[in-house]
Regions:
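Gly/Ser/Thr-enriched, mixed-charge loops and adjacent short helices
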Residues: 2, 109-257
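Buried hydrophobic positions in well-ordered alpha/beta secondary-structure cores of metabolic enzymes
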Residues: 8, 46, 84, 97, ...
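N-terminal small/polar loop signature for handling phosphorylated ligands or for N-terminal nucleophile
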Residues: 28, 32, 43-108, 216-277
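Short glycine-centered, acidic/aromatic-flanked micro-motifs in structured strand/loop junctions
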Residues: 46-50, 203-205, 278, 363, ...
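Phosphate-binding and adjacent anionic-ligand microenvironments
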Residues: 108, 263, 304-497
Length: 497
């Protein structure tokens, strides 16, 4: 078993499918693929977050990258992923290798790769690297010397593992702070002026590595920030580092209300996802935040309004409804920002967004960047004179209120089983499934004229089936949860002999 390719990079369970040695072999294959593609050895930045064995993996990656032909290697502790993308885009490196599992639980770790011009590797390069990784794993055998057995390490074990690995490797150790400062300065420079509206905010870093960077941005905006979970921790303080989970947003929402703050910001473990919370402690869904920022850019004539907008198949339908008013094309892509970045690179779109707080705007770069999104939000609040809560309420009044739902069902299913299970679940909830438009951009998606929709797709990282959808708020209370439950039962029935 090896790390599996995910929506962004490669992920595995620590001590099992993820080991520092395996991460180093993967890094070597990525460098090899990039060398073959570019015709020369890349300059490489190696970053790592606070997860177990991350430092050990990063140190072995430094050696592996050097051995594979990298021209220069720098290692940076706690480098947020959007900052790494910015640095590659700015020409400080041709490749960033980041030891992180992003929003996944603390039992996971992995490797993300960012190439020129500051985004995930293009699809062909990623496939080539993955094929080389397969070859490398077969050559290494099932149990390479020095890899952990899968049993949990204690602190002494981890300290010994972290202590070694670079005695004969040439590298430069760098502090992330100056690069974070450069990134924030770049983001603010892309606005007509730095927004001038002091606010009280709550920032929850979920004990990952991006909370302190978001605090730096708040300082630059003259926002007074209350920090939560802004000190990195290997177990993320017992809270999942995924802001899309309601439980992970709860303490920020409570703090916003207790502190009488204007808004809250919750970022994921490596900083490439952000959720906003309004002054009433209510979550602003990512597609609502995306729509607000798109409308603001449209009014202020920012960006390239002649270009399209891209969303993933799991993104709320509000963005399509909004863009239809402006006659802007919307391109729907599979889940994973690696499917949206190429459209930014090609100039076909000037903004892209997913369903989990992963937003990008062309003025800031070609990869998702919560720092850019928050800077735009600051500009919106300063120029509109309205609160985030008021802006969202107006948006819902004009375009309708939909309840978002997302759930997970264990086990696998074929496309046919997903299609049949979705139809069965929709009919149990009172829909006429025969009237649905079915698309297969990623999994099976049912869309209705009412704006409601249901998507069933296999998870690329943790396995099982992801269930997403939006239902009108006027439906009976609990309708979204009931639909998710019907999907689970229908899938179980489809799998039964």
């Amino acid at each position: 078993m090896r790390m599996r390719r995910s929506a962004d990079g490669w992920r595995g369970l620590i001590g099992s499918t993820f080991t520092p040695e395996r991460a180093a072999r993967l890094a070597a294959t990525i460098v090899t693929a990039v060398r073959a593609h570019d015709g020369g050895g890349p300059r490489v930045v190696v970053g790592y977050d606070c997860r177990r064995l991350g430092r050990r993996a990063a140190r072995l990656i430094v050696r592996a990258a050097s051995d594979a032909g990298a021209r220069a290697v720098r290692i940076v502790e706690h480098l947020p992923t959007p900052t790494a993308s910015y640095l590659v885009g700015a020409g400080d490196a041709e490749l960033a290798l980041l030891v992180t599992a992003s929003h996944n639980p603390p039992e996971w770790n992995g490797v993300k790769a960012k190439g020129r011009p500051g985004c995930p590797l293009d699809a062909e390069l990623e496939r080539r690297a993955d094929a080389l990784f397969d070859d490398s794993e077969r050559a290494a055998g099932d149990a390479p010397f020095g890899e952990p057995s899968g049993e949990p390490f204690d602190q002494a074990d981890e300290a010994r593992a972290d202590a070694g690995g670079l005695d004969d490797a040439i590298f430069e150790a760098c502090d992330a702070s100056p690069w974070i400062d450069r990134h924030i300065a770049h983001v603010l420079s892309r606005l007509p002026a730095t927004p001038d509206l002091p606010l009280r905010v709550v920032v929850d870093g979920l004990s990952g590595i991006a909370g302190s960077a978001m605090l730096h941005l708040c300082d630059a905006l003259r926002w007074s920030a209350t920090p939560l979970g802004c000190a990195p921790s290997a177990d993320f303080g017992g809270v999942a580092p995924d802001p899309s989970l309601p439980a992970s947003r709860r303490r920020a929402a409570e703090a916003v209300c207790a502190e009488h703050a204007d808004l809250g910001l919750v970022v994921d473990g490596d900083g490439d996802r952000v959720y906003a919370i309004d002054s009433d402690g209510r979550t602003v869904e990512p597609h609502e935040l995306f729509a607000l920022l798109l409308a603001h850019r449209h009014r202020r004539r920012y960006g390239h309004p002649e270009r399209g907008v891209a969303v993933t198949a799991a993104t709320g339908a509000l963005v399509q409804r909004l863009c239809a008013r402006w006659s802007r094309p919307v391109i729907e892509q599979p889940v994973g920002f690696k499917h949206l970045s190429p459209l930014l690179v090609e100039g076909r779109i000037d903004a892209g967004g997913g369903s989990v707080g992963d937003l990008a705007f062309a003025e800031f770069g070609v990869d998702r960047d919560p720092f850019g999104a928050v800077a735009l939000l600051a500009d919106l609040l300063a120029t509109s004179g309205q609160s985030l809560a008021a802006l969202v309420a107006d948006l819902r009044h004009r375009y309708g209120r939909f309840d978002w739902h997302e759930s997970h069902v264990n086990g696998d299913a074929t496309d046919t089983q997903l299609r049949d299970a979705g139809r069965r679940a929709l009919e149990r909830c009172g829909f006429d499934a025969r009237t649905a438009r079915i698309t297969t951009v990623d999994g099976i998606k049912f869309s209705f004229d009412s704006g409601e929709w249901l998507l069933l797709r296999p998870s690329t990282t943790e396995g099982g089936i992801r269930v997403y959808g939006e239902l009108l708020s006027t439906r009976a209370a609990g309708a979204a949860a009931a639909l998710a439950a019907h999907v689970a039962r229908a899938l179980a029935a489809e799998r039964s002999p």
